């Protein structure tokens, strides 16, 4: 008698669209070659009732809902609290992604240490390390409270039972790709497993009021591995960025139901763990060369925080038939657009040159306010002149060569003044909001040509 073939379905890894057959292009998100085959998960945990534990299935008046139990918890790190919107919201689900070795587990262990020392019940669940390995890493970051609960488990049924029994205030899952739901007939890390496991954990977090952190692996493109629907299910998505071989780390929010997604947190990796960088501008500008052409300081605003960064450019005669153009730390297409503006509007010949643009320190910034800085760095390199070290610039550049206004100009100027800069080149449209700032020279410009002339003085 022939064995009964298990029914399979196809899922889009980008948006979670489900299909009975493979498709080249997803009808949901229009992406190509994103479908993977998985066993049909129907009849599993997603079908066995979706009522969250501890919640009644009846409507409640909005005015009758108490907010006293939902005060935010401090993580002990101001940088992390800033990105989260002021701390951890009770019952929230936070997904943290990043490259291997970037520091995801380290920062969560430091958060667990602070919360456990503050008297909260904290459960750290690892599917990747043994208890001894976790303790070794904990010893590296300092003394940890004996009340911190550790568990090495990947079976979701056992994890659910322990969470319901312990009722922790905060729970860490490291990582979601190692969790295994017995009711889903596929391997750990598959689309079905990740989706179903996240759904079960979300019900626990919302029903029991457990604040949950989930660690997610990332793909080579930098997105969290697994279905895109994973990012839609959680409340907050954070990405840890930075070069593993350098000491700095950038924590950036890309989704936050309880705060802004424009904030960043800056950390430095040391032997004792991650340390907050309270003054990122000073940190980013350390080691800047003196009297070097192709270098300029610009200002980018991430959320409410102005950050001064060094933009470097190198322009030289091409070695091969086709000019080589690269951009590190900023948008490549934007750099090409700005080079076209330079050639057309300012008469700077770049067609026969190789051009390299870099945001020093490895940080990635894409704000339009950096346009003027990129242009001046390119001109400084191709004409081989030095922009004074005490000059800071910002402004968006249009296709006609005009310098357009940007937001939070006053905060940018104040940051430059605080760090000892004496001159700021800024859009003339922003001059009124900055005029009252004393102790620093403000040079308003309307066009790129004016900015180039002022940068030589």
Question: At which residue positions do the language-model features occur?
Answer:
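Conserved RecA-like ASCE P-loop NTPase motor core of nucleic-acid helicases/translocases
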Residues: 122-126
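Divalent metal-dependent catalytic cores for phosphoryl transfer on phosphate-bearing substrates
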Residues: 131
């Amino acid at each position: 008698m022939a064995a009964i073939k298990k029914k399979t379905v196809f899922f889009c890894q980008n948006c979670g669209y489900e299909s009975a057959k493979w498709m080249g292009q997803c009808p949901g998100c229009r992406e190509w070659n994103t479908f993977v085959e998985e066993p049909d998960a129907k009849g599993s945990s997603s079908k066995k009732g979706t009522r969250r534990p501890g919640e009644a299935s009846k409507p409640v008046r909005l005015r009758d809902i108490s907010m006293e139990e939902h005060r935010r918890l401090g993580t002990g790190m101001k940088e992390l609290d800033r990105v989260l919107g002021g701390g951890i919201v009770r019952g929230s689900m936070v997904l943290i992604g990043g490259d291997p070795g970037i520091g995801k587990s380290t920062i969560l262990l430091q958060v667990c240490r602070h919360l456990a020392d503050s008297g909260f019940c904290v459960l750290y669940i690892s599917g990747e390390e043994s208890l001894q390995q976790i303790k070794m890493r904990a010893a590296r970051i300092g003394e940890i409270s004996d009340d911190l609960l550790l568990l090495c488990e990947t079976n979701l049924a056992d994890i659910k039972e322990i969470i319901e029994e312990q009722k922790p205030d905060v729970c860490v899952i490291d990582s979601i790709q190692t969790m295994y739901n017995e009711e889903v007939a596929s391997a750990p890390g598959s689309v079905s497993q990740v989706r179903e496991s996240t759904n079960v954990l979300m019900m626990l977090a919302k029903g029991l009021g457990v604040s949950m952190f989930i660690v997610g692996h990332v793909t080579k493109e930098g997105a969290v591995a697994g279905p895109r629907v994973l990012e839609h299910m959680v409340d907050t998505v954070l990405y840890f960025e930075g070069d593993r071989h350098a000491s700095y780390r950038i924590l950036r929010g890309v989704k936050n139901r309880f705060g802004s997604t424009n904030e960043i947190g800056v950390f430095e990796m040391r032997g004792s763990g991650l340390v907050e960088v309270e003054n990122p501008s000073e940190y980013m500008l350390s080691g800047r060369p003196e009297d070097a052409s192709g270098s300029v300081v610009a200002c980018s605003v991430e959320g409410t925080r102005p950050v001064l960064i060094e933009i470097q450019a190198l322009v030289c005669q091409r070695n091969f038939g086709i000019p080589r153009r690269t951009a590190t730390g900023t948008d490549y297409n934007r750099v090409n657009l700005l080079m076209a503006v330079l050639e057309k509007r300012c008469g700077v010949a770049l067609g026969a040159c190789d051009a390299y643009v870099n945001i020093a320190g490895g940080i990635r910034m894409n704000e339009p306010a950096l346009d003027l800085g990129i242009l001046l760095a390119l001109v400084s390199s191709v004409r081989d002149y030095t922009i004074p070290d005490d000059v800071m610039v910002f402004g968006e550049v249009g296709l006609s060569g005009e310098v357009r206004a940007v937001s939070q100009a006053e905060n940018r100027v104040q940051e430059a003044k605080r760090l000892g800069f004496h001159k700021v080149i800024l859009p003339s449209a922003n001059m009124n909001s900055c005029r009252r700032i004393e102790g620093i020279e403000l040079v308003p410009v309307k066009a790129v040509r004016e900015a180039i002339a002022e940068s030589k003085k």
